[in-house]
A protein has these predicted regions:
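Glycine/proline-rich active-site loop of Rossmann-fold NAD(P)-dependent oxidoreductases
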Residues: 47-50, 59, 71-82, 112-123, ...
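Amphipathic terminal alpha-helices
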Residues: 186-209
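Conserved catalytic-site region of short-chain dehydrogenase/reductase
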Residues: 22-32, 41, 71-75
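Conserved C-terminal active-site "lid" loop/helix of NAD(P)H-dependent oxidoreductases
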Residues: 138, 158-181
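NAD(P)-cofactor binding segment of oxidoreductase domains
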Residues: 1-18, 51
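Mid/C-terminal beta-alpha module of Rossmann-like enzyme folds, strongest
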Residues: 109-110, 116-159, 204-208
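Catalytic helix-loop patch of NAD(P)-dependent Rossmann-fold dehydrogenases
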Residues: 29-65
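Substrate-positioning beta->alpha
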Residues: 76-81, 91-114
Length: 209
């Protein structure tokens, strides 16, 4: 990221958008988090992301860092794929929050950030309503008539591939700064479209983000 930042400083670009991740937030108690709450990195990946953000942010006066939550839409969405394949499971009591954003809304945010030059800073891009695992699968079950996934124990933090977090990511800043209006304000609108797409014979299964 240092080499990229150095190149940006000499390239004279008018605006820069860097896509980061809401995984920089390591909170575990279901609390709301904003752009100022990523100050306690817990692992190598988070450290690398935060360092990259800072390097790019210092590359010029018109840099927007977009911290994206889990992206879904045509071709994306591993939990949806698991549900449709009958391999999904609800971890623990199902009350851990999921933060998601539709691909189209992410693209819209990128375009706005490029066009509205001068909105320098870090912004979360996520939908309006974090939902729990339980509510997500309950909605899918009720909408499709398929059975609910089984409950399984929470992953052991000491053996999990990545840190298990539980937080609700706020999108207030990006909406206020860019006037962003989500086409898919919650997962319901987005996955209703995905279910319609599959029902109309467009059977390309979603892939993992």
């Amino acid at each position: 990221s240092k080499h990229v930042a150095q190149w940006l400083k000499t390239a004279g670009t008018q605006s820069v958008v860097f896509i980061s991740s809401t995984s920089v937030y390591q909170q575990t108690n279901g609390e709301w988090v904003s752009e100022n709450d990523a100050d306690t990195p817990q692992n190598i990946t988070t450290n690398i992301l935060l360092e990259a953000e800072q390097n790019i942010l210092e590359a010029g006066p018109a840099v927007a860092i977009l911290r994206s939550s889990g992206i879904y839409g045509p071709g994306r969405g591993h939990l949806f794929r698991q549900f449709m394949n009958g391999t999904a499971a609800i971890e623990g009591d199902g009350k851990r929050f999921l933060n998601m954003v539709h691909l189209d809304d992410l693209v819209e945010a990128i375009i706005l950030a490029l066009e509205l030059v001068g909105r320098h800073g870090i912004y979360n891009i996520t939908d309006d309503e974090p939902g729990t695992q339980l509510n997500f699968f309950k909605w899918l079950s009720e909408t499709t008539g398929r059975p609910m996934p089984p409950f399984v124990p929470e992953p052991n933090p000491s053996t999990a591939k990545r840190r298990i977090t539980n937080k609700r990511v706020s999108n207030k800043l990006i909406k206020k700064t860019f006037g962003l209006l989500h086409n898919y304000p919650t997962f319901r609108e987005g996955f209703t479209q995905e279910l319609d797409r599959l029902a109309n014979g467009k059977t390309r299964q979603p892939l993992s983000p």
